[in-house]
Amino acid sequence: DVELTPDMVMTVYGSQEGMGHLGMALCDEGDVVLLPDPCYPVFAAGSLMAGAKPYYYPLVAEHDFLPYVKDIPEEVARKARYMVVSLPSNPVGSIATPGIYEEIVEFARKYDILIIHDNAYSDIIYDGAHGGSFLAVPGAREVGVEFFSLSKSFNVTGARISFLVGRPDVIAALRKLRSQIDFGMFLPIQKAAIAALNGPLESVQEQCNMNQERRDALCNGLREIGWDLPNGKGTMFVWARIPGGRTDSMAFCMELMEKAGVIVTPGASFGPHGEGYVRFALVLPPDKIREVIDAIRRSGI
């Protein structure tokens, strides 16, 4: 559990909007921000518009696609304004492992860095693993804030219902910026969100189970046709290395679409370290996913 006071909570129109505006609220021109690579593109948007300089820390298979703060140069860390972390992670599908948040908190304390944690997929974690909040880790409330979203957990993507919790000074900075942009979330939507959070949560687990069945069908199928072990421990996405040693993800995606009729997202669209990978979205039922696997197999790609 995480204890919060009112000055540690605010609503936002989706974590994407909140993330973009938070970068604008916190950054000055020339500030350094630490961003994952690969990452969801909006992580960079607000800071770039504010004139900040991104330093991309790699998420690689050797470290299970998790942040490895020991590889961030000290001269970069000393200049950093904040670090964005996202677990479970879109696009790479990794989830927090024991000790990872503690390492990040220690790193943040050492270099006086704010941690912005995107927890939009907190309820979509597979194989009996548990998510929870970054802020539950001792010391995290002093160094971080965290975005939560109802979009994925409750299947209300278009409603744009999210909230930011954590350090009061960061909440105040974003609230000040947004006070000049909008007048808050539509009240009926807020009441619907309250009802969802306080109501029965069986549907959240049912949706997670549904996504896990899709994940299993996709990952098992890809392995059967010769792909490397895909990464899909959480989120509604699976991150997979392109087979055959191919590295041009855009060219592969175009060929896959033309020859198999299958559309996936090129890894390079999420950053340089995404090259050589593709992202699958778990948007089809298992029987359709098996048809997709068969189409890929028959294409000969």
Label each region the model flagged.
Residues 1-301:
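PLP-dependent class I/II
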